[in-house]
Regions:
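Structural signature of FAD isoalloxazine-binding scaffolds in flavoprotein oxidoreductases
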Residues: 76-94, 214
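Beta-strand segments within the central parallel beta-sheet cores of soluble alpha/beta enzyme folds
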Residues: 99-101, 145-152, 182-194, 332-337
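C-terminal nucleotide
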Residues: 1-62, 87, 91-122, 219-378, ...
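Glycine- and acidic-rich phosphate- and metal-coordinating loops
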Residues: 133-156
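Alpha/beta catalytic cores of group-transfer enzymes, especially the acyltransferase/condensing modules
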Residues: 180-229, 338, 364-367, 379
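DPxDG-like acidic metal-binding loop motif
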Residues: 81-83, 160-180, 392
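Phosphate-handling active-site elements
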Residues: 138-146, 174-188, 394-399
């Protein structure tokens, strides 16, 4: 443990470079992190104290690579942590107060002796702090007060799961400040989903939190959501000759909770036609044989979204197999199929509330013009706004 000056000296002296390299990959990126972390340490000294013992923390954003909107209906996903992350400099306190000052935002202050759900906090970051603390206790772990400064390169509303990265960051601080690092990544993800569902009041699945918490390239099967099956997918992406690009369309996710919730509720409305709670429990052949009756009961869009679920859920297995076989061209074809399904069937490329605003649609159209026959592109994550995902051949990346 070190005070702020000792921490800064260690960062600038290269003592963290091996750990930075695991997260940020290139030497150039590692050097850029020196000033980023030192700047955050200076923030801590200015806001709290330069003399307290402090520690560094990081939680990545995520990109969903396969299985678009399948997790909340207990499906499969293929996801990856990315090197855009939320970071923190933090120190324990003995006040039972959590203070988190995120750069550019006002300080969140949470009295953790009161972990009741607060209606006025729903949709705001204090709810995530309170929810993470409540979740740690619910799972039998320790909590305590701490002071932290944070900053994030995972832009809010970008489709890279800024809220999940923030939740996992708070969970990681609680884990190492009060639980000696004994809380595993899967449990932190479950607690993060609990915080977002119950305290933040957003009905998300578990994929975002799991990818942010576990990191790397992972496939996750949520058939039993209390015990999701997480498997690493080993693939040398550098050998593919492509770069994974996340393209910001400048649209925001901040106004779209109802659109996201409708996807889950409509999929579940189809499941209810078969006496089930989620689509993973429904037999696909039975569903297809009864489409006329189902569409009369729950509507055409719900049927289309169910069709997307079944196809994209099965497609994840094909994507994983292609990667493990080193067949990147086949993998790209599945990426294109997934994007087409999201656009036509899941219909999460633009909001029907704002039909004149279609930045994701435009970005996908331009990507097709530029990358057809060369790369792959798709909407990812929640959709409707934010970012798209593109696999771009390195030889045309600069163009």
């Amino acid at each position: 443990m070190a005070n702020v000056q000792m921490l800064k000296d260690a960062i600038l002296g290269g003592e963290y470079d091996l750990r930075f390299k695991r997260v940020y990959v290139t030497e150039e990126a590692v050097k850029a992190q020196h000033q980023r972390y030192v700047g955050l340490a200076n923030d801590f000294a200015e806001i709290f104290s330069a003399d307290r013992e402090v520690r560094l923390f990081s939680a990545p954003g995520r990109t969903e690579v396969g299985g678009n909107h399948t997790d909340h209906n207990h499906g499969r996903v293929l996801a990856a942590g990315i090197n855009l992350d939320a970071i923190a400099v933090a120190s324990k306190n003995d006040e039972n107060i959590v203070r988190v000052k995120s750069r550019g935002y006002k300080m969140d202050v949470c009295d953790i002796t009161d972990l009741e759900i607060k209606e006025d906090e729903k949709g705001h970051s204090p709810a995530l702090v309170r929810g993470m603390c409540a979740g740690f206790l619910k799972y039998g772990y320790k909590i305590g007060g701490f002071d932290a400064v944070t900053m994030s390169s995972v832009l809010s509303g970008s489709g890279l799961s800024s809220s999940a990265a923030y939740e996992v960051l708070v969970g990681t601080m609680l884990n190492y400040l009060y639980n000696d690092g004994q809380v595993d990544a899967v449990t932190i993800a479950k607690i993060a989903q609990y915080a977002e569902n119950v305290y933040f009041d957003k009905p998300c699945g578990l994929m975002d939190q799991m990818a942010c918490s576990v990191g790397g390239f992972v496939t996750i099967d949520f058939n039993n959501p209390s015990e999701p099956v997480v498997e690493e997918v080993k693939f040398d992406f550098a050998s593919s000759g492509h770069s994974l690009c996340i393209v910001d369309t400048k649209g925001s996710h901040s106004d779209l909770t109802d659109d996201y919730a409708a996807i889950r509720s409509e999929m579940e409305s189809v499941a209810s036609c078969f006496g089930k709670s989620v689509l993973r429990e429904v037999d696909e052949e039975e569903f297809r044989s009864k489409i006329p009756a189902v569409r009369k009961k729950v509507g055409d869009r719900a049927v289309l979204r169910a069709m997307h679920f079944f196809a994209d859920n099965a497609r994840v297995l094909k994507e994983v197999e292609a990667l493990r076989n080193g067949d990147f061209e086949t993998f790209k074809s599945y990426i294109l199929e997934s994007g087409d399904s999201s656009y036509k069937y899941n219909q999460n490329v633009f909001s029907v509330k704002k039909p004149l605003e279609q930045p994701v649609s435009l970005a996908l159209a331009l990507s097709e013009e530029l990358l057809k026959g060369k790369g792959a592109w798709r909407v990812h994550g929640g959709g409707f706004a934010g970012t798209i995902q593109a696999f771009v051949p390195n030889d045309i990346l600069a163009d």
